[in-house]
């Protein structure tokens, strides 16, 4: 049987929200999507929480969404993966953590670094507690905690409460001292603002900063000065708790981007971001996840799970041609993340990057972004008849949704709808079956209940419309079901690793 041609069109940030004035998708004129929903089989997909490998109730995002779509399975993300390890006890047996604690047991200190909150974006306080418990259970005597304060992913003055929790937990166990405090502004920079990293480094390695033996008092003093958690200036609470040569250091953040610079400053002999007054050499340094592929000398407690037999890999193995196309903002999502977190470009896989507009500071000023250019190039490629599978992302509903500007979000939705109309027409003309869907919601809720702008993703379901086929669909599913559906349409058997289920109703 010959392979059917299939195109997947991902409308980023296009969720199914309440039919009200705060929903840009509902308020927009969308004649194309309306027509598709009226004519073709469609269903609703879960794109958040446990259904995409995130904690229950947590909104999805583009990275997670595309990984689940492209791999055809629920891929547990770092936060629930580590939390699950704590719950089943494997965290406390992790050989990478254990080796660092063994080093500390031989006369060295253990330093635990991490963002102290339950925001769940970069870290989780529960994971820090678990590391203190592991150190206690293994009899580590000198345990020093270097706490970055949040104030972005949680309330701006919630830090004092987290500091109290950690202080009390350490006192209860008789293990660990809060040694330094500082806002994430300093120790978690990601934009090579090395003066910030230097101030943080000097507190942890040199003992320089505001001196206050009481971490809770230090927080209250910062608030009294009008400085909230994110911007708390480095405080040293335990002067003899400096990071010194040969010590063990465990960075508990699981999100790499804001852990990378500090890791380089603490570990790399050729680091040149600033002149280090003191260098702590031969640290037994552990990254909780892989912070940078270049840091090959550092052990990783939870290395990335390798995803094999993804949609792109299977299609390539059948000798078929595929196209990935998006503008800059979502290009990594239809390539790197869609392929399971690997830079590998499979045989027969072509990639097209359309530049996102750079001359505007925010996308509410250009809600069409580069959608028209993406559409034009996609239609041109469709008409060649070259590709057996196409994956395209339109970024607008997500990126403009993030601005919180309702009028711009409506324009973004309408622009995407017009582009979708031309893509569908060309694809049907060339014999493609299309799946029109989204990776998560955003523009479907632009306004909070109190009337303030909502700039975040939503936990709403997302649509999936099967255009060009009257095969009946299951009434609900999740993002990981898209890949097996596409393979069924292409008459290709999925691999066992692809645990998602086809959305096509079994007769």
What residue ranges belong to the model's regions?
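Feature captures the catalytic ectodomains and active-site-proximal regions of enzymes
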Residues: 1-507
């Amino acid at each position: 049987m010959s392979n059917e041609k299939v195109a997947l069109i991902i409308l980023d940030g296009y969720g199914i929200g309440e039919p009200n004035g705060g929903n840009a998708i509902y308020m927009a004129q969308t004649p194309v999507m309306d027509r598709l929903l009226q004519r073709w089989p469609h269903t609703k997909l879960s794109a958040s929480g446990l259904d995409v490998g995130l904690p229950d109730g947590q909104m999805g995002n583009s990275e997670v969404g595309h990984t689940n779509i492209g791999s055809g399975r629920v891929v547990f993300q770092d936060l629930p993966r580590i939390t699950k390890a704590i719950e089943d006890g494997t965290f406390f047996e992790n050989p990478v953590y254990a080796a660092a604690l063994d080093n500390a047991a031989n006369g060295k200190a253990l330093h635990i670094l991490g963002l102290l909150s339950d925001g769940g974006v970069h870290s989780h306080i529960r994971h820090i507690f678990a590391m203190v418990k592991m150190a206690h259970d293994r009899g580590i005597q000198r345990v020093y905690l270097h706490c970055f304060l949040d104030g972005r992913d949680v309330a701006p003055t919630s830090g004092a409460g987290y500091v109290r929790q950690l202080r009390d937990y350490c006192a209860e166990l008789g293990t660990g001292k809060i040694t330094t405090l500082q806002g994430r502004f300093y120790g978690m920079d990601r934009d090579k603002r090395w003066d910030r990293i230097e101030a943080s480094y000097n507190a942890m390695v040199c003992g320089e900063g505001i001196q206050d033996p009481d971490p809770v008092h230090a927080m209250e003093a910062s608030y009294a000065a009008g400085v909230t958690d994110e911007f708390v200036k480095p405080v040293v609470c335990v002067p003899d708790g400096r990071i010194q040569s040969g010590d063990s250091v465990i960075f508990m953040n699981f999100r790499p981007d804001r852990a990378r610079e500090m890791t380089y400053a603490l570990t790399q002999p050729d680091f040149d971001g600033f002149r280090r007054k003191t260098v702590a050499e031969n640290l037994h340094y552990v990254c909780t996840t892989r912070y940078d592929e270049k840091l090959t000398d550092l052990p990783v407690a939870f290395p990335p799970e390798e995803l094999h037999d993804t949609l792109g890999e299977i299609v390539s193995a059948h000798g078929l041609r595929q196209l990935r196309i998006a503008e800059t903002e979502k290009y990594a999502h239809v390539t790197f993340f869609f392929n399971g977190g690997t830079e590998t470009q499979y045989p027969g896989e072509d990639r097209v990057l359309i530049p996102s507009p750079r001359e505007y500071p925010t996308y509410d000023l250009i809600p069409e972004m580069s959608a028209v250019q993406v559409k034009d190039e996609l239609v041109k490629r469709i008409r060649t008849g070259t590709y057996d599978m196409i994956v395209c992302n339109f970024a607008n509903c997500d990126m403009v949704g993030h601005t919180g500007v309702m009028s711009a979000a409506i324009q973004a939705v309408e622009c995407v709808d017009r582009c979708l109309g031309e893509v569908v027409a060309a694809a049907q003309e060339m014999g493609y079956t299309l799946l029109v869907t989204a990776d998560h919601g955003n523009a479907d809720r632009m306004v909070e209940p109190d009337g303030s702008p909502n700039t975040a993703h939503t936990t709403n379901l997302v649509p999936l419309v099967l255009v060009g086929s009257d095969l009946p669909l299951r009434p609900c599913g999740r993002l990981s079901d898209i890949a097996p559906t596409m393979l069924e349409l292409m008459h290709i058997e999925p691999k066992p690793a692809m645990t998602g289920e086809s959305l096509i109703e079994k007769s």
